[in-house]
Amino acid sequence: MRKDRLLHLCLVLLLILLSASDSNSTEPQYMVLVPSLLHTEAPKKGCVLLSHLNETVTVSASLESGRENRSLFTDLVAEKDLFHCVSFTLPRISASSEVAFLSIQIKGPTQDFRKRNTVLVLNTQSLVFVQTDKPMYKPGQTVRFRVVSVDENFRPRNELIPLIYLENPRRNRIAQWQSLKLEAGINQLSFPLSSEPIQGSYRVVVQTESGGRIQHPFTVEEFVLPKFEVKVQVPKIISIMDEKVNITVCGEYTYGKPVPGLATVSLCRKLSRVLNCDKQEVCEEFSQQLNSNGCITQQVHTKMLQITNTGFEMKLRVEARIREEGTDLEVTANRISEITNIVSKLKFVKVDSHFRQGIPFFAQVLLVDGKGVPIPNKLFFISVNDANYYSNATTNEQGLAQFSINTTSISVNKLFVRVFTVHPNLCFHYSWVAEDHQGAQHTANRVFSLSGSYIHLEPVAGTLPCGHTETITAHYTLNRQAMGELSELSFHYLIMAKGVIVRSGTHTLPVESGDMKGSFALSFPVESDVAPIARMFIFAILPDGEVVGDSEKFEIENCLANKVDLSFSPAQSPPASHAHLQVAAAPQSLCALRAVDQSVLLMKPEAELSVSSVYNLLTVKDLTNFPDNVDQQEEEQGHCPRPFFIHNGAIYVPLSSNEADIYSFLKGMGLKVFTNSKIRKPKSCSVIPSVSAGAVGQGYYGAGLGVVERPYVPQLGTYNVIPLNNEQSSGPVPETVRSYFPETWIWELVAVNSSGVAEVGVTVPDTITEWKAGAFCLSEDAGLGISSTASLRAFQPFFVELTMPYSVIRGEVFTLKATVLNYLPKCIRVSVQLKASPAFLASQNTKGEESYCICGNERQTLSWTVTPKTLGNVNFSVSAEAMQSLELCGNEVVEVPEIKRKDTVIKTLLVEAEGIEQEKTFSSMTCASGANVSEQLSLKLPSNVVKESARASFSVLGDILGSAMQNIQNLLQMPYGCGEQNMVLFAPNIYVLNYLNETQQLTQEIKAKAVGYLITGYQRQLNYKHQDGSYSTFGERYGRNQGNTWLTAFVLKTFAQARSYIFIDEAHITQSLTWLSQMQKDNGCFRSSGSLLNNAIKGGVEDEATLSAYVTIALLEIPLPVTNPIVRNALFCLESAWNVAKEGTHGSHVYTKALLAYAFSLLGKQNQNREILNSLDKEAVKEDNLVHWERPQRPKAPVGHLYQTQAPSAEVEMTSYVLLAYLTAQPAPTSGDLTSATNIVKWIMKQQNAQGGFSSTQDTVVALHALSRYGAATFTRTEKTAQVTVQDSQTFSTNFQVDNNNLLLLQQISLPELPGEYVITVTGERCVYLQTSMKYNILPEKEDSPFALKVQTVPQTCDGHKAHTSFQISLTISYTGNRPASNMVIVDVKMVSGFIPLKPTVKMLERSSSVSRTEVSNNHVLIYVEQVTNQTLSFSFMVLQDIPVGDLKPAIVKVYDYYETDESVVAEYIAPCSTDTEHGNV
């Protein structure tokens, strides 16, 4: 070791003797700085420094990519010294990115400097974000959202968005928009959810021009908005030194008032490991009544929580539940407190990243406790390079201390600084958590300089706030000899942010005699262009070409140039009053406003659009180092001529590769440098004897270490809080009637005027809550701006709430409760009135008083016993009015509010008749040809009709689809809960749109309505899709169902036809077609898969030929060409089937023949079509110019009815297929075809129900399809009219006229007499469509039925208080009819008045293999049973009392065959305590 040191010293002496003194050089110096990452289509800068020029030169920059060479800039420079930055813009490139060569040339008469280096060129990517109007939606609501695009400077981009789509939780695409042009950088879209969407997480997906994919999630679920919020205040951090912890729990209504009730709080520490079997988690629980402020506060001793014991999580889990007084509504909130054993913690808040010999090394530390609270006046220790020498310092009142290290005599290359308060304790106890005193450490490398000249930018602590000018201190030490003959030295600086040079400048320093030490200040405005991170580089070139410089990083507040302010005026306003939303932004900004009920945000907090979230979209926030594929610099390839360097007679021997140099500063900022100056430290290529540890230590012992005595001013961010304007208020309104309760209130785009202001007049909704509003604005000049949240509290000093049941049966008695709440600070005297009505009788239960005294934050509840007298919807109007009174409330004087002295709430009660509702419909198509046509209408009622329940109406329409168009989403008075039934909500819209298009009657209003139904129906149908592309009646629920061939074909053709009107994902069509092709057998027929719910058509559909005919029809209606292989093969199957069918007996295969006739017609096989139609004509039922077809095995019609029953579903369906076969005859139907079709249509129209549908789903779909084809084939525009007169035998008579102007208008009148005899007369010269609908209730009677039904309650009698409020409904059913099994059966259980089903117990029924689905709809429970046989099925579920009702009437349970609705049975049940005279149910 000693020998090596002697050899090293000898070598150094030899080099000194051989070295020659270097002379100062005044050669021209060049430096060009360009970012290594360049974005296209946006201005970029490169900075040029020329020094000591002695001739005019041309500076040029060019970019070479592929075969293209593009000039970026050219500058002619005549000045001796020049520093400036030049702007240039790159055009968009074909690829998203490419590596290019940047060439710099500086050329003059004697100068020719050339450098070439790589840079990465990227196409500019827009920053796209999505905002929804709220974070969660209920089924059936409309999702509204905005798509916004800005560039990297946050200015709006009017780009073309190639694709936007919505995905449901199964990742099915349910909507899409293509080639959407953004205007002013924004576009607003909306999408209606179906009434039964898949619940879960949805997402909006945006694909940008550059190929980027942005996703924004939202949730769809059924929910009830919370009335109040539970706020839990616990310390974020609990120290093991704490003896007590304060827990505060408050309940606050969304309108800001305290909640009365009981709070229960539990505090738990869970075990940290499951293996701790010898311990149990520690929990404490307490309950208290909330005080008048809606809060409780409790001190908990930490010993009870064992916070110093090991084996538990270092967390305290707090759960608080508040049960609201009066309603027992519970809301829960959870919080977690971290438990820390950190007693003190030191951290560097401001420290030099490197050190420079001769410039003090500065550092600032902050001492905090485990909760982050500063510890003042505390002594701590400072150690340098782990030496045995320590210094110390004391923190100030803010817990801060600043110190410096004198670096003059430091000769090593690394500085290791450690600060600590307590020496580490190596002892450890397994049962107790030990105190932890954390120190901090920092390593700084030395900066290399040949001359010992340095410049240093002092770091700044914290984040710099926008809107002020920041001053940066630059310290320097300069070797006078290195200055040569300079009289002044120019320091140049530039600032980079987001990877772009944004600022530049120069500071000139006079050169003094002798070595120079000192500092100067640089300042720059802190604005959005330097956020979020600014990097400053300062440098100067000495005469010999050495570059001295430094770089520093500054954290900048995320801010935007467009300052947006949003405020409500007034900030508190009563419901239904007028308010103003004021927006201030950069002039001509377009502002997007949103205001949401705070309850929505309480239920589903969302990641709000904020300045931070927008900054997170930036592709480059801070450019550090070079991109991987351009990390090559020409200078890096230089050779190393010798292992030492001589400068001014001194020898420099590199000791470490960790030293920093100018090149490392530039590279750290991502800057490419083109220069002939000295920016690198010398390279060490040979092994140099290392310096001993002792030598390193001595270097630091000589360092002076001391505390800098200067005050510290923390640099904290400041925000301007603009108070809401409370000067304006709405005028006095004597009374409010509240009925408008939205979840999203404001969703608008508003343009700001040239003064930068916009004011929007709004009407406050009726919800008593707090509305949270936000806005973002877009300006071409100022870019994007985002407001802070503005609030409006919708509130009135007192209001009334009503409690009543959803429905009652006439004769029942219920209690109507009205609660008046007073939130005025003073007492008021209130008069509460229930508006009288002939529709009900009411008597007040409490002692009748003219007015009631209600003091501040108190409530008064009044009740009435109500007996409804009329049927239908009955309105109850309750008003609470503050009265003038000289009478005292207690000891207080009564006050009257200045505004909103009266509050009125109107709620509707459905009063139903006793018994079971029946509906009879009489429909006909009547054509007058100049002569009068009369019909007799005899309306009779059965003997068991319920008094006053009968009502009838008469309707006239001029269009064959008029009735269906009026009720397109309500064609059947039946549930739609399966995949087939949903299609009756979907398919008819297509037929209506096609028909109105063909007849040129389609209006925008009708189109918008039908398209909306298609969109929601499409969503619903996807619920029944299988992964393989098939569909089944109830979807892939519980893995019980296979894909259904028939339903898949039905959905496939309907989706394909809907493509003309709405977006349908092609993947759904392709997958279904593929699945069906796999079902095709070698003989061309299709294999049956899955189960059908309608046995009436199973005989045909399960037969290969019938199913194959149906599937072929579906494929042809897509339409697939006849030449398609699947269709061509199917034709072989159908031809074989017809050859078999025509050999059958009379009446057999009627359904199959009807399908084959239509299929051959679509295939263009007219010979087969005619052959089949002739065969069917022989089997037709013809009567009174009406034609239809029946099944041979048709069930017998019930006897003893007043009216002929509606035709079964299967017969309407097969008759409609025959009609389609006539109408699709090619090349066109003959006059004979149309005559036959007219007689068929007349029969079909007579089967139509009051809503325009038929008896079930498939007959409705096929019949409306056929009627639409008939209507289009026979439609003619004529000026002729028709008159319709309806009159009775007395004085009633009404006339209607039908002409071209009112073809689609539903003309309707109520008929006065029931029972009654009416005469209908039609005159004129056109066809009209007449319909009479009669409804009445009958009392249940024992009848023969193919179903056996038994219903009972558990308990059966009123055997205790619990039976008043809850009981179980149990029922059994079986099928006793002529068939082996029923079709799908609906069990419809109506609730007893005042009771509601317990939904979880209903849902559990779906676990049964016989139950396919359950629904809770209003006051009914629906159970879908796939089929019922002679085996008894049992079901049961619980019901709970919601509202007390007295004199309870029995409720009805109805079981019916969905496809043969005449097959039904009805039974009654009664609540156990409905006849309890002692307690009653009230």
UniProtKB/Swiss-Prot annotation:
Tissues expressing this chain: Plasma. Prominent constituent of late-pregnancy sera.
Keyword DNA-binding attached: no
Top-rank lineage group of the source organism: Eukaryota
Phenotype for R1128H: In a colorectal cancer sample; somatic mutation
Record's keyword terms, sorted: Bait region, Disulfide bond, Glycoprotein, Protease inhibitor, Secreted, Serine protease inhibitor, Signal, Thioester bond
Stretches the record annotates as Bait region: 685-735
Cellular location(s): Secreted
Signal found in the keyword field: yes
GO molecular function: endopeptidase inhibitor activity; protease binding; serine-type endopeptidase inhibitor activity
Entry's Gene Ontology BP terms: female pregnancy
Glycosylation sites: N54, N69, N246, N392, N406, N753, N875, N932, N997, N1430
SUPFAM superfamilies associated with the record: Alpha-macroglobulin receptor domain, E set domains, Terpenoid cyclases/Protein prenyltransferases
Sequence intervals crossing the membrane: none
GO cellular component: blood microparticle; extracellular exosome; extracellular region; extracellular space
Function of the protein: Is able to inhibit all four classes of proteinases by a unique 'trapping' mechanism. This protein has a peptide stretch, called the 'bait region' which contains specific cleavage sites for different proteinases. When a proteinase cleaves the bait region, a conformational change is induced in the protein which traps the proteinase. The entrapped enzyme remains active against low molecular weight substrates (activity against high molecular weight substrates is greatly reduced).
Subunit organization: Homotetramer, which consists of two pairs of disulfide-linked chains.
Protein family membership: Belongs to the protease inhibitor I39 (alpha-2-macroglobulin) family.
Record protein name field: Pregnancy zone protein
Lineage: Eukaryota, Metazoa, Chordata, Craniata, Vertebrata
